[in-house]
Amino acid sequence: MKRGLLVSLEGPDGAGKSSVLEALVPILEAQGHQVVTTREPGGVPISEAIREVILDQNNTEMDGKTELLLYIASRRQHLIEKVLPALEAGKLVIMDRFIDSSVAYQGFGRGLDVADIEWLNQYATDGLKPDLTLYFDLDVEEGLARIAKNKNREVNRLDLEGLEMHQRVRQGYLYSLEKDPERLVKIDASQALEDVVKDSLAVLNQHLNSKS
């Protein structure tokens, strides 16, 4: 059986990744794709338990390296238990965050060594990278304003970080975009949701058609 495709959605907090993913799935399924959606951290019970620890607002003393290693542990279990089996079954796997989040948040955001993070990503994934990454770019202030307005969104520990941290995170994403422009495609997330979905679908379909 032909291996499936792995797509990751990345971007700063408030960029709307989850809303875009929710809108894309029925469209892609109507096109005949078997779609598996999942998220990081989380996706499987062990990884979801780690997610609770990472995002708990009460864990204010968490060290940056501790945070990174928890993400890496969650990533490994999620990959082995859910992502790889779906890819082997020929499915289209779309992940809400993956390896680029660690570079952005723990590398640029927390100031940890990016080379160390890239090595840990490689170790945890056995070198697996997404076939395509959609990076939803948004001004940091606008993203945080969206979070504040969204009463249905549970505020987590990372949401409580200051503006400068979130600005560094965005710079981390722009670093990854420049480093790997063939894999990462920038989407303007400041547009209306329907336009963001339209742009995302166009990029996805172009990639899917090139692989068919």
UniProtKB/Swiss-Prot annotation:
PANTHER family with a match to the protein in the record: THYMIDYLATE KINASE, UMP-CMP KINASE 2, MITOCHONDRIAL
Keywords (A to Z) from UniProt: ATP-binding, Kinase, Nucleotide biosynthesis, Nucleotide-binding, Transferase
GO cellular component terms listed in the entry, alphabetical order: cytosol
Role description: Phosphorylation of dTMP to form dTDP in both de novo and salvage pathways of dTTP synthesis.
GO molecular function, one term: dTMP kinase activity
Its EC number(s): 2.7.4.9
One Pfam family this sequence matches: Thymidylate_kin
InterPro entries, per the entry: P-loop_NTPase, Thymidylate_kin-like_dom, Thymidylate_kin_CS, Thymidylate_kinase
Reactions listed under catalytic activity: dTMP + ATP = dTDP + ADP
GO biological process: dTDP biosynthetic process; dTTP biosynthetic process; dUDP biosynthetic process
Keyword check for Transferase: yes
Signal sequence region: none
Residues the record lists as binding ATP: 11-18
Protein name, as recorded: Thymidylate kinase
The UniProt record lists the keyword ATP-binding: yes
Highest classification ranks of the organism: Bacteria, Bacillati, Bacillota, Bacilli, Lactobacillales
Gene: tmk
HAMAP family listed in its UniProt record: Thymidylate_kinase
Family membership noted in the UniProt record: Belongs to the thymidylate kinase family.
